[in-house]
Amino acid sequence: MLADTVTYKPVFVDPTQAIYDTLIDQVASWRLPPAMERYILRKTKTIKPQFHAIPKVHKDPWTLRPIVPSHSWVTTTTSEVIDYLCQPLLKQFPWIVNSSKEVINQIEKVRTLGTEPIWILTGDVTAFYTNIPPKPCSKMLGKIWEVFCKESSISSRAIKQMVRFVMDNNFLEYRGQTFHQMNGLAIGTACAPVVANLYAAWYERKARVCHQNGVLMYVRYIDDILCLFQGTALDAKALCENLKIGPLRISWSHSLERNEFLDIEMLRMPNISPRVLHTRLFRKPMNRHLYIPWSSAHPSHVKKGFVKAELIRFAIICSTYEYFADARKEFYGNLRRRGYPAQTLEEWFKQVTYDNRQALLVFRKKDESKVPLMLSGHYNPVWDYVDVKKVITEARRFWVKEELPNALQEPLIRSLGRTKSLFDLMSTWNKTVLLSISDIAEEG
């Protein structure tokens, strides 16, 4: 993958200090709010991302997804600020979805326009992140900011320069060799999803794709597109051919009967009016359903939580009780094979019913002004004997005396993670040994 010299160029002089100096020189000219500027200046690190790739085993033949974990690189803080500033802009493009629940809600509202056939079109943007050109992308983000954030104290010029700084300085390291990613966004930088989404949305808005004749519904989840189109085969083909997202290529799949999008299988059946199509759970053929085993040391409430979450997901996705019952039955069998007791599962399964589907489809409004207090720690049986409510009550008595901020009145939530295991330590050790052997072999 790194042999692709169009995308990745070997670098033989360490660019870290030069990039850091550029950031320090530019940040003042961006005229960001003081808190953001301080964050960038104080929190920026200079650790080069270590390149690795994840195989897409569901593809035939296998391909690789490049990962550049940019959590401690020079561009990291700037990327995080871009992500924070641009996230609200996604609300201006309602066809950008974040979950299957949003897709189902839109499907439920679709109604036919006539008697012509309805096509289920799905598209995939090829190598979305790594094919976005930096210069046009930064200009486009600046335009979007100028259109929708006219009253902001932050200028569109600053947004443009920040995006360009992040995209122009995608450097990575592999086995001691530094590479420069010449094109696109690093898959691992904080702003990648929002920048890519806005880049594509600008072209979609310009093409007025949601308002074209025959388009019953159009949504996109990052690089996956779903369109319900009513018209002839030639009309459907023309729609797919005419939709362009800059220089990016979109591969399309179309059907009159069935197709899948995310974890939703869509079925078009005769005589189902007024519903346009039915939906049910879609599972990839290679899914082995390797849920947390019952023998795991995870607390019971964690296991119960994911089981109920899955059942809620099934209820949301499945358009009929029969589809929900089929998904639930298969899920039950998979959990039993992972060692879950039948009696426990029966108790948990009773807590999610298909009768509540309409309520589950409703989005609850979140009060973003309230942020809960997080009590971090590790999974440990001792937590079963700790009453968190009593802990926070006693703590607040002290906080009131000290006249600490009202933010400390928010609820306390336990945030627990697992400790390092022998498996973790052995994996790190094996990686170190294998890399050392590989380096020795290359040297000679």
Where are the regions that the model predicts?
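Charged structural interfaces that engage phosphate-rich ligands
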Residues: 1-444
